[in-house]
Amino acid sequence: MTAIVEAFGKPHVNVGTIGHVDHGKTTLTAAITKHYGNFVAYDQIDKAPEERKRGITIATAHVEYQTEKRHYAHVDCPGHADYVKNMIVGAAQMDAAILVVSGVDGPMPQTREHILLAKQVGVGYIVVYINKADVADADMIDLVEMEVRELLSKYGFPGDEVPVVVGSALKALEDDSSEYGKKSIDKLMEKLDEYVAVPPRPVDLPFLLPIEDVFSISGRGTVVTGRIEKGEIKTGEEIEIIGLKATQKTICTGVEMFKKLLDKGSAGLNVGILLRGTKREEVERGQVLAKPGTITPHRKFKAEVYILKKEEGGRHTPFFANYQPQFYLRTTDVTGSIKLLDGKEMVMPGDNVSVEVELQVPIAMDKGLRFAIREGGRTVGSGVVSEILE
């Protein structure tokens, strides 16, 4: 069991509210915490604390609540730009998103943008809450549901299966006992519990460790250190060293932590791993150790990126096609060039765009890997791999 499960005695899921401005994301967050958590007032959520991830400041409010079956951590962002940054930078990885759509207005531009981003960054499940049902016309609500389902299907979510709950976050917040009031929140929680699968714990995934440092210990061989990102490793297991150069195979002959030898190392631990027959110069920071056959090195990929504004410490000027910054992937900087898509000629600070990246050397990667874009050692943007090209 993970530490989180032990702490709450229940499986843990990360969720977030997404949707167009003023459709009621924060009111819904307040209503959920009122009935299922430690109540957090609307104006407290709206004064979200600032969180820094990779040098990027994002205002995010974290609240928590629980049903009989699960514990949920919930993130709500005050501004649209913060949602975009949060999803790309992954300040809070969302396992599922609650898409809030006003029953009066229906889907709007940010509704689409948030759905597309959710898909690109790997949010697994979406549950829909059609809000403001108390002031919307019944026919309009049916139409909105149809439109939202079509939109979800268009962006690769199972639009026909996605649960849709109709209600009024404001009524729920006011303790109204009608169908659109507290009952709609109960129904939403029920749907989250039923529809969203608990994500596999990192320890159950295949072993992966990004190498941070390499040492040579006389008489014992080469030791690499780093934090195990996922899975576990036992002495005697075969592993691959991937990225930067040709993939090599080796055997783990020991796992150490604080000078003690362990039987195995698992996700979340900072460890040293002894490698059999591997020379000091054959391994370097930026490579990863992984279970054989589970991850491959790549140079070309598509990504969703957010470029910092000048006020956020980013560039002061736009960049153009073939811009060549450094990409900080896991533990190392690699130079690469950016190709702009969809006929775009330049990218302004503050923009969120889809790009193609070609690195100078291959790096172990999967869809969903997050990275920082740096120039002269400072972060100028952030991104997430949306598709591997080669």
From Swiss-Prot:
Residues bound to GTP: 19-26, 76-80, 131-134
Enzyme Commission code: 3.6.5.3
CC per GO annotation: cytoplasm
Enzyme class label: hydrolase
Region: G3, residue numbers: 76-79
CDD domains to which the protein is assigned, alphabetical: EF_Tu, EFTU_II, EFTU_III
KW Nuclease (keyword) present: no
Region listing for G4, in residue ranges: 131-134
InterPro entries: EF-Tu_GTP-bd (IPR041709), EF-Tu_GTPase (IPR050055), EFTu-like_2 (IPR004161), EFTU_2 (IPR033720), G_TR_CS (IPR031157), P-loop_NTPase (IPR027417), Small_GTP-bd (IPR005225), T_Tr_GTP-bd_dom (IPR000795)
Superkingdom assignment: Bacteria
Any Pfam family: GTP_EFTU
Location of the tr-type G domain: 10-201
G5: annotated segments: 168-170
Region annotation (G1) ranges: 19-26
PROSITE patterns: G_TR_1, G_TR_2
Location in the cell: Cytoplasm
Keyword rRNA-binding recorded: no
Catalytic activity: GTP + H2O = GDP + phosphate + H(+)
GO MF annotations, alphabetized: GTP binding; GTPase activity; guanosine tetraphosphate binding; translation elongation factor activity
Swiss-Prot/TrEMBL keywords: Cytoplasm, Elongation factor, GTP-binding, Hydrolase, Magnesium, Metal-binding, Nucleotide-binding, Protein biosynthesis
Cross-referenced Gene3D superfamilies: P-loop containing nucleotide triphosphate hydrolases (3.40.50.300), Translation factors (2.40.30.10)
Family membership: Belongs to the TRAFAC class translation factor GTPase superfamily. Classic translation factor GTPase family. EF-Tu/EF-1A subfamily.
Function text: GTP hydrolase that promotes the GTP-dependent binding of aminoacyl-tRNA to the A-site of ribosomes during protein biosynthesis.
HAMAP family (alphabetical): EF_Tu_B
Subunit structure: Monomer.
Entry protein name: Elongation factor Tu 2
Originating organism: Wolbachia pipientis wMel
